[in-house]
């Protein structure tokens, strides 16, 4: 497999609570023949995609990262599902919503306007579509034989389906395929692709807790 470089946006969580995930992803990338080249001076994506049509300033950090990848001629890779959701949706805005594109570019004052040219990929998409799970399986040194793992997708990776284009929103399989590739057995259970209530946890705490409890108590099918 040819060595490739991807622009990489780690995001805040992978710099704090999930440092191990960042380190393992970089090491795995090297072992599989590609490199994650971290975006310079990246800023927080905001963690939540702004739904207001007049929200421009909160999208600028994503536009900046996307433009840096464009200038390098590289695809942009993310790992955090929240970052991936925000950046991919902002990229879609810059590509398809003229008012947002114009106003964001006016704020940024870039040498060349950004118009959604960068391809945004989740790390799992690189493994599935660029590396291939068969190749990954061959590279595994210590397969997780005998382990049973249940994947939780949530909604950020999958919806809205036409924009995220990550997997089938109703019946995703990419994480289960990854689990098989590393030697473990995937466990299918209800609510694995349902919302955990993260977006409403501050305003509707009880509702969010109820949504989360459904995921916790669901039994494998």
Task: Give the positions of each predicted feature.
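Short connector loops at secondary-structure junctions
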Residues: 35-55, 156, 181-207
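Extreme N-terminal starter segment of soluble prokaryotic enzymes
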Residues: 2-7
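Short N-terminal binding/cap micro-motifs at the start of the first secondary-structure element
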Residues: 14-21
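Short, structured active-site "lid" loops
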Residues: 53-74, 207-212
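Hydrophobic, aromatic-enriched interface-forming segments
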Residues: 142-177
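Short catalytic helix/loop segments, enriched in acidic residues and glycine
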Residues: 22-36, 169-180
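Short mixed-charge
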Residues: 93-117
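Residue-level detector of conserved catalytic or cofactor/ligand-binding positions
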Residues: 215-221
């Amino acid at each position: 497999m040819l060595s490739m470089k991807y622009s990489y946006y780690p995001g805040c969580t992978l710099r704090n609570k999930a440092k191990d995930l960042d380190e393992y992803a970089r090491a795995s990338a090297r072992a599989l023949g590609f490199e994650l080249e971290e975006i310079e001076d990246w800023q927080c994506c905001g963690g939540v995609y702004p739904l207001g049509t007049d929200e421009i300033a909160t999208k600028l950090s994503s536009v900046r990262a996307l433009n840096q990848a464009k200038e390098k001629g590289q695809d942009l890779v993310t790992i955090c599902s929240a970052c991936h959701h925000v950046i991919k949706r902002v990229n879609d805005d810059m590509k398809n919503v003229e008012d947002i594109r114009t106003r964001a570019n006016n704020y940024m004052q870039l040498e060349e306007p950004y118009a959604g040219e960068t391809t945004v990929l989740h790390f799992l998409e690189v493994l599935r579509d660029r590396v291939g799970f068969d190749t990954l399986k061959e590279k595994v040194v210590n397969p997780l034989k005998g382990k049973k793992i249940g994947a939780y997708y949530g909604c950020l990776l999958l919806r809205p389906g036409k924009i995220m284009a990550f997997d089938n929103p109703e019946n995703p399989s990419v994480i289960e395929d990854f689990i098989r590739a590393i030697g473990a057995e995937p466990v299918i259970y209800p609510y694995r692709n349902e919302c955990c209530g993260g977006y409403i946890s501050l305003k509707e705490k009880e509702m969010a807790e109820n949504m989360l409890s459904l995921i916790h108590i669901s039994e494998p099918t």
